[in-house]
Design a protein with these regions (language model features):
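Residue-level marker for isolated small/hydroxyl-bearing positions within beta-strands
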Residues: 18, 57, 102, 151-153
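Repeated scaffold domains used in trafficking and secretory/extracellular systems
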Residues: 2-8, 40-47, 83-91, 131-141, ...
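Structural motif
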Residues: 20-22, 61-65, 108-114, 157-167
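Short loop/turn segments that connect beta-strands within beta-propeller blades
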Residues: 27-29, 68-70, 118-120, 171-173
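A short beta-strand motif characteristic of beta-propeller blades
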Residues: 31-37, 72-80, 122-128, 177-179
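Residue-level detector of Asp-centered blade-edge/turn motifs that repeat once per structural unit
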Residues: 10-11, 49-50, 94-95, 143-144
Length: 250
């Protein structure tokens, strides 16, 4: 398979590869089954735990839902008018009934968490849309703890600059048990998580924070194989995070 994918993920029956302009679907023998060209700037995808559908999100505010059997586009829509910077990840609920997507709707510096029903991908609600100076960068469901975790940033009302970095649980669509990180811990965790959800591809690694931050931060001087071996998760990050705020002074 000679194509250079930004994202390459799979389940027990199919693999999905994203080049940015084409969504490829393969069987587990590497045979190409479909090549969808419905989107541009498409770098993120996630497969339902039920194995029946998958979602692709673009950085320019669009989303497409595809079925595996039959292989076809089910729905495509624009979820935001913000064109650019829509590269935060997304996740299905463990029962496959709901879908959570981190989205920017008013500014790339502010996010909300959109919740959709997966039977028709209608919008259920937009969580945290009323929060100012608030940005999520990652969401993950952890099977071991049966809980969602989110990674985020709070901004100072005075300077409008980031001054608090956190990882929290999402329970009943509310943030609870917030724990705190240093700026460096949050940035490193976000960099690893972005590679994880993209399937640790070489292309994603080459254009990640690991490409340029290694020049001044030794934590980033590691190989892609070493990053995979970290077995990184937001649940583990939360477990080891501080229970008291680590706030950057204005």
């Amino acid at each position: 398979m000679a194509k250079k994918f930004w994202t390459f993920i799979g389940n027990d029956k199919y693999d999905i590869g994203l080049t940015g302009s084409t969504v490829y679907v393969y069987d587990k023998n590497g045979t190409e089954l479909a090549a969808f060209k419905d989107l541009t700037y498409a770098y993120n995808a996630v497969i339902s735990p039920l194995g029946d559908i998958f979602v692709v999100k673009t950085t320019d505010g669009r989303m497409a839902i595809y079925s595996f059997e039959p292989l076809k586009l089910i729905k495509k829509f624009r979820f935001s008018k913000i064109d650019g910077g829509q590269d935060e990840n997304m996740v299905f609920s463990p029962d496959g009934k709901y879908f959570y997507s981190i989205e920017s709707h008013t500014s790339t510096l502010k996010t909300l968490l959109a919740k959709y029903k997966t039977d028709d991908f209608s919008l259920v609600c937009q969580l945290f849309s009323d929060r100012e100076r608030f940005r999520l960068s990652a969401i993950e469901y952890d099977e071991n703890t049966d809980c969602y975790y989110v990674l985020g940033i709070l901004y100072s009302p005075v300077t409008k600059m980031a001054n608090t970095w956190f990882v929290a649980k999402l329970v009943d669509d509310e943030l609870v048990d917030m724990r705190y990180l240093t700026e460096g811990e949050r940035d490193f965790g976000d960099a690893v998580n972005r590679l994880k959800v993209m399937g640790y591809t070489e292309k994603a690694f080459q254009w990640s924070a690991f490409r340029y931050k290694k020049e001044y931060d030794d934590r980033y001087k590691i190989s892609l194989d070493e990053i995979k071996a970290l077995n990184y998760s937001l649940a583990a990050l939360w477990k080891n995070a501080s229970t008291t705020p680590i706030e950057k002074k204005d």
